[in-house]
């Protein structure tokens, strides 16, 4: 694996093997936050002195696949998914538009049928009006016949009063045929009234039948609308089933991809373990440079503070010398000096506050480190549960191995964790110069093998860099204090013997980079396993939902078939009823026509008889 620099970059082989005494500081090392506030206007960051082309070549060598390409591929896949969703939404919109058009057509058909029914109602109303007019005409004829009868009786009375001779025939002989005719006319009038009543009853029954037919038509239309709705729902359910099947296929594909990614990650973890063994020495050298730089910054801060104190004391001495020859009223401190002393005291107060904040952050970082190492222990217990235990030889008096750092030291495994649990801090073992050069040359050999398969590890590497920067918003340069003591084994031994564990530097960034990366990769593997299990469970749930939807569709189709059969039966019964009503109407019309012809013949006979009677009367009077 590649060596991490202070700004998140990588070191070449020549730069990693250079001795410690470098005239220029490490490239692009930024000043710490507390020092930057005071000396930002006085000092600028040092320009890099290493070759940028060599760094770029080394980066391209280590990275087999570009993370930008991976991200672009992921974005293209997301765009394709969004396009697919958009096409599905367009298809649903088209289906809804078609259903709306069908509903509009059904509404238009219903309006046409209602218009036809209105026309039929108007025809029946016109027939009723014509029947009422006929009844009025019959009543008027009846009144006219009664008036003619009364007039005939009056004429007969006058004739009877005018008769004086006894030779004329009796009045009873003349009145008898007239009374018979009157009885016949009255009986005919009664028959006509009965016919009129029967016609009224028939019209009312026909109106009731028409209303029933309208109701049945409305119910049939409502059932047809229900059938259309059921068909639309069936189509929607079929579409949902297709969508669920497509989602199931997509989830299967994603599951296969995740399984392949997990296999790739396991392979990259193995290769990273091999590369981590060679990258520890270069990382330790980088830590040494960073620690030296931070110590130089602290020395400069102390020198600045001493210079400020010297200025303040010099100003005070000057004021005392100047006030020796003055009176008591004139001995006043100058405003400029007072402002400078006030600024100096405020700076010291701010430094004390910064120290308090740093101590709080150190305490928080220690707590977070404890949590992190406990989590690492859990992860390692889960991963190494089935593996055989490996015995590790402990080197006395903190001496380093001659063949380079072991895997446990570079990864930050169980050995260092046991020492951390017992002492509260991690002991570091720095390699000798010869092992340092050999390990730095082995970085390139391992990097060539790992660059081809290192596809998905860039995100975890970025996370490792973020963790290395510290939980309390430390700058990366503050980590130089912890790595400064690994410059030589003698100084580390003396400091470890003289200082108690409480005075040693806080293990905010004591762990090497490879250990963090290994833990992150282990976490990602566990998370991927959990996500694959959850996806399997979600696939099972979706299969169950698809089965439920299929059952619902079957029940709906059966219900639709039953409703369609009922509708067909009802429509056939309605057609039969309409045919019977038409036959009844035809018979009624024929009966009406025959009844209309019969009274006309009877009235003709009555008029002929009346005319004959009148002619007989005139003859008798003559």
UniProtKB/Swiss-Prot annotation:
Residues 66-365, 541-590 form a coiled coil. InterPro entries: MAP70. Keywords: Cell wall biogenesis/degradation, Coiled coil, Cytoplasm, Cytoskeleton, Microtubule. One of its GO terms (molecular function) is microtubule binding. GO terms for cellular component: cortical microtubule, transverse to long axis; phragmoplast; spindle. One of its GO terms (biological process) is cell wall organization. Transmembrane segments: none annotated. The keyword ATP-binding does not apply. Residues 400-425, 432-453, 594-605 have a biased composition (Polar residues). Residues 250-483 are annotated as: Required for targeting to microtubules. Induction: Down-regulated during senescence. Plant-specific protein that interact with microtubules. In association with MAP70.5, is essential for the normal banding pattern of secondary cell wall and for the proper development of xylem tracheary elements and wood formation. Interacts with MAP70.5 and itself. Belongs to the MAP70 family. This is Microtubule-associated protein 70-1. It comes from Arabidopsis thaliana (Mouse-ear cress). The gene is MAP70.1.
């Amino acid at each position: 694996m590649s060596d991490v620099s202070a700004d998140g970059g990588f070191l070449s082989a020549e730069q990693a093997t250079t001795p410690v005494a470098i005239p220029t500081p490490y490239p692009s090392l930024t000043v710490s936050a507390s020092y930057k506030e005071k000396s930002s206007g006085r000092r600028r960051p040092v320009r890099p002195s290493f070759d940028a082309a060599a760094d770029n070549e080394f980066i391209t060598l280590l990275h087999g696949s570009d993370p930008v390409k991976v991200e672009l591929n992921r974005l293209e896949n997301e765009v394709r998914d969004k396009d697919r969703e958009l096409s599905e939404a367009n298809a649903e919109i088209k289906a809804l538009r078609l259903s709306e058009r069908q509903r509009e057509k059904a509404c238009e058909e219903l309006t046409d049928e209602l218009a036809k029914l209105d026309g039929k109602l108007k025809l029946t109303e016109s027939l009723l009006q014509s029947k009422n007019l006929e009844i009025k005409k019959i009543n008027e004829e009846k009144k006219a016949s009664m008036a003619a009868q009364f007039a005939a009786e009056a004429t007969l009375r006058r004739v009877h009063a005018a008769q004086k001779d006894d030779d004329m025939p009796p009045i009873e002989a003349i009145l008898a045929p007239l009374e018979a005719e009157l009885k016949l006319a009255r009986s005919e009038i009664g028959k006509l009234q009965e016919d009129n009543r029967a016609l009224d009853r028939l019209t009312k029954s026909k109106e009731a039948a028409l209303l029933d037919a309208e109701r049945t038509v409305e119910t049939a239309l409502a059932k047809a609308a229900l059938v259309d709705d059921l068909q639309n729902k069936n189509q929607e359910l079929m579409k949902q089933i297709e969508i669920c099947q497509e989602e199931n296929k997509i989830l299967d594909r994603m599951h296969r991809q995740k399984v392949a990614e997990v296999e790739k990650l396991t392979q990259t973890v193995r290769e990273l373990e091999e590369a981590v063994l060679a990258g520890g020495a270069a990382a330790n050298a980088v830590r040494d440079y960073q620690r030296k730089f931070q110590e130089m910054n602290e020395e400069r801060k102390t020198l600045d503070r001493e210079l400020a104190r010297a200025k303040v004391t010099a100003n005070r001495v000057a004021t005392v010398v100047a006030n020796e020859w003055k009176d008591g009223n004139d001995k006043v401190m100058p405003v400029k000096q007072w402002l400078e002393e006030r600024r100096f005291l405020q700076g010291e107060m701010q430094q004390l506050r910064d120290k308090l904040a740093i101590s709080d952050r150190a305490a928080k970082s220690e707590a977070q480190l404890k949590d992190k190492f406990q989590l690492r222990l859990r992860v390692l217990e889960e991963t190494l549960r089935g593996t055989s235990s490996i015995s590790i030889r402990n080197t006395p008096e903190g001496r380093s191995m001659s063949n380079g750092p072991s895997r446990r030291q570079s990864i930050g495994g169980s050995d260092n964790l046991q020492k951390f649990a017992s002492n509260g801090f991690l002991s570091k073992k720095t390699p000798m110069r010869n092992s340092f050069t050999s390990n730095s040359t082995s970085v390139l050999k391992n990097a060539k093998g790992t660059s081809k398969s290192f596809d998905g590890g860039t995100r975890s590497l970025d996370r490792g860099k973020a963790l290395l920067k510290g939980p309390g918003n430390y700058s990366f340069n503050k980590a130089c204090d912890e790595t400064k003591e690994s410059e030589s084994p003698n100084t580390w031994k003396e400091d470890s013997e003289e200082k108690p564990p409480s005075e040693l530097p806080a293990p905010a960034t004591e762990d090497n980079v490879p250990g963090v990366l290994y833990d992150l990769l282990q976490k990602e593997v566990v998370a991927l396993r959990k996500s694959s299990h959850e996806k399997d469970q979600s696939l099972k749930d979706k299969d169950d939902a698809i089965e439920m939807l299929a059952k619902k569709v079957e029940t709906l189709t059966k219900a639709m078939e039953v409703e369609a059969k009922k509708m067909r039966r009802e429509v056939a019964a309605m057609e039969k009823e309409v045919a019977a009503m038409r036959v009844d109407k035809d018979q009624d019309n024929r009966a009406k026509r025959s009844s209309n012809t019969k009274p006309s013949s009877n009235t003709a006979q009555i008029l002929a008889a009346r005319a004959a009677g009148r002619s007989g009367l005139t003859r008798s009077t003559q």
